[in-house]
């Protein structure tokens, strides 16, 4: 495993040293654009909470607390009871009906596929994975390997040391997993490892000749009416299985409702009752005081309850005793089950809570709940600018590099009044700045690493005020991301990252810092993801700017992951040589990584004679 960890250290070192470009893993664009025009199929019936036995006041209080907590960053919330949607809220600027990255929540879907394979008699729980993939490991090595079964993968007890960090080390993830060392006796100790799920996906492909996505489309996604989804593959074409799935919140709810209905949907048995029974049973204890683990899903606090769980707040919580499903998408700063968001939800649905069959309708409470959801969906000061049906399509303006606007480097006296947005916009319009340090990307590091889509580095930034609209343009490699900026409410746009288009919503604010320096604050939300990019642009004298970058959630988790790797590598010769070549200690590495996550870079005004082409029209 040291080789893979060194690859991570090498990637981190390249970031610190300002080296842009790829990793050891081949990149190819694969993410499709969100299918705006696709018709949504099999939507749930909507009902009032009271008609299904729960008070509107309960949901209103829950949503307020989730929104107010400094430890939560809510994106989508949905609640079902008896198969009907009784509460749904989309927190600005995340729109209703948009797919969202699910992270590890999709592991539970991979588990469903394994159950289907077993039902079709194409696989057995006790099969040795080395027998399934005989061509990926040499016969001599196999002699000294313990038996690792399909069930060990399902319960996260394989003990294989090749884990998530290894995916940056090369293209052959399956071969690396099968040839990696094993800690302990398989089946005895819970060690969460997303590559276990990846290998389950590879097993589906091995036994069927189809990718996991191809296998599930007619068996699961199609019957459920799930059409707006995308699941990433590895460089070898195997569906990632344990991460990389984009899915809409209501479709996540369908997957929970399917298990409430014992695997049956519209009269068709999609997942066997036997599989649901054994997969939702606790097979072993887990760390961090969670409630146990089944087959690719987690036990929850209420007796008999369980959840499909993904980091940063992607959850489908199933309460069989209440015939209820809850769905969350979020960008929290915490990883798994032991988090503030889930604790807040548990507070409102404790073990001793039992909803009624039906409650009297309460028009006032329901009206207040709907108003609250509207306020959260609009954000403070109505924080939405364009409709889902057309806003991003109109604002997709990433394009190949060229200059087509009149150049101006005048800053008027209006800069002295930054609260006057339009005066400030006019003052900076037409100005282009060349960045001194050109290794920062528009995408957060989380997006870059998870999708193996590394930045080419922002070289220029420019500002345009046109017909009452304000734009900030970032030149990154050969692409210009021209982002409309909303003030008071976010404006919808799109960025082109090496052929993959990511929808964003950009919110701006003009202010002054404690030294009376004008500042443009930008919050760039990647609305299909869990993360936001933040930039504070300081307009100094002498035609100079400084940009202080940040991302959320970010530094805490990135540094925690780095710490676990550097601790394991502290005595490794190659690792120490790698750092020694650059006179970097482990302590300095962490300090430099902090600066890489939250860099401050300067830019200098680009004069007319430096501009590629100048439009001189007045």
Give the ranges of each region predicted by the language model:
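N-terminal leader/targeting segments and the immediately adjacent pre-domain N-terminus
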Residues: 1-95, 118-123, 363-438, 445, ...
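Active-site SXXK
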Residues: 83, 101-126, 153, 200-204, ...
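Active-site helix/loop module of the DD-peptidase/beta-lactamase fold
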Residues: 120-158, 179, 210-243
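A small/polar active-site loop signature that marks catalytic segments
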Residues: 158-233
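Active-site-proximal alpha-helical segments within enzyme catalytic domains
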Residues: 196-203, 241-264, 314-331
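Active-site-proximal binding-pocket segments
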Residues: 216-217, 221-280
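Active-site Gly/Thr loop motif
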Residues: 276-328
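Substrate-recognition/cap regions that form aromatic- and gly/pro-loop-enriched pockets
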Residues: 432-554, 560-567
